[in-house]
Amino acid sequence: MSTNRRFDPNFTPYVVNSMGPKTPERARVVLGALIRHIHDFAREVELTSAEWMLGVEFINSIGKISTPIRNECHRICDVIGLESLVDEIANKIVTEDGVSPTSNVILGPFWSPNAPFRELGDSIIQDPNPNGKVTYMHGVLKDMETGAPIVGAVLDIWQASANGQYDFQDPNQSENNLRGKFRSNEKGEFNWYCYHPTPYSLPTDGPAGVLLNLMDRSPMRPAHIHLMITHPDYATVINQIYPSDDPHLDIDSVFAVKDDLVVDFKPKTDDPKAQLDLEYNVTMALKKHHPNPNSAPPVSSFERFNKASKTQEKL
């Protein structure tokens, strides 16, 4: 904070205390902290009127470019790391013994509630891409403390195709291509066929692109497979699974890479349906360990898909 004595030390408390008695308590806490930090930021950098107006215009531009299927504010929060930070605050689990489950990361905007259930061993590839490398993905779900298999968990997987586009972005893909839900068996096992993921760039035609360019940062996202795992007794796990040889791991534009989510894809020679093999085991924590055990999983900004609307966005 600036120590410049020109600034009235009573101004910020005056603004915070202007909230009336009917303000909900949580809103009072959140808005009060927000006002204090924004005021401290302005004092610290001694924000000029021109810079303030530039910020106002930038915020306006976020709203102007957003549509029902393009949430630019969501993307801005991603590129400044806010969504990843909120996810860490909301979902980080560490027991008193220092035990943690498989890491949680951001959901991203392109999860769909409409993915169909498939049988173990099925493929989520409905529209083959000639550049796609078919992968046999398999693993076991276990309790992080006991190691017991977790039976009947729902594993919801989705990914972009080999062209870097999700199903509803690409008119050549059918609905729910590269999406599916599976249930773990009596041994906690799961398996299916998918693609080795493909890296892609965030859209750079809007405010997020302007901001990334200003900060001299790459818009690239490393290749990843999305996975959300739910069970009535366990805290939800949301993953993005990354190939260890992806060149963008250290410069992920949304700061979602975590060490235990980086995996090795290995050649597969004993299965005519797959070129690669991915073993990915997951540990889950009982809900009692979650900081907010009754919280619902996050909902995608684009939960309501409109198949008639095709865009060129990527995230």
Swiss-Prot record:
Binding-site positions, Fe cation: Y166, Y200, H224, H226
Induction: Expression is induced in the presence of caffeic acid, p-coumaric acid, p-hydroxybenzoic acid, protocatechuic acid, and benzoic acid.
Composition bias type Basic and acidic residues, residue spans: 304-315
One Pfam entry name: Dioxygenase_C
Gene disruption: observed consequences: Abolishes growth on benzoic acid, benzaldehyde, benzyl alcohol, p-anisic acid, p-anisyl alcohol, m-hydroxybenzoic acid and p-hydroxybenzoic acid; and reduces growth on p-coumaric acid, cinnamic acid, protocatechuic acid, p-coumaric acid, and caffeic acid.
Region feature Disordered, mapped onto this chain: 287-315
Record GO biological process: catabolic process; catechol-containing compound metabolic process
Catalytic activity: 3,4-dihydroxybenzoate + O2 = 3-carboxy-cis,cis-muconate + 2 H(+)
Cofactors demanded by this protein: Fe(3+)
Keywords: Aromatic hydrocarbons catabolism, Dioxygenase, Iron, Metal-binding, Oxidoreductase
Cofactor binding, note field: Binds 1 Fe(3+) ion per subunit.
Family to which this protein belongs: Belongs to the intradiol ring-cleavage dioxygenase family.
Subunit structure: Homodimer.
Stated role: Intradiol ring-cleavage dioxygenase; part of the benzoic acid degradation pathway also known as the protocatechuic acid pathway. Benzoic acid debradation begins with the conversion of benzoic acid into 4-hydroxybenzoic acid through hydroxylation by the benzoate-4-monooxygenase bphA, and its partner NADPH-cytochrome P450 reductase cprA which act as a mediator in electron donation from NADPH. 4-Hydroxybenzoic acid is then converted into 3,4-dihydroxybenzoic acid (also called protocatechuic acid) by the p-hydroxybenzoate-m-hydroxylase phhA.
Protein name as catalogued: Intradiol ring-cleavage dioxygenase prcA
Natural source organism: Aspergillus niger (strain ATCC MYA-4892 / CBS 513.88 / FGSC A1513)
Gene field: prcA
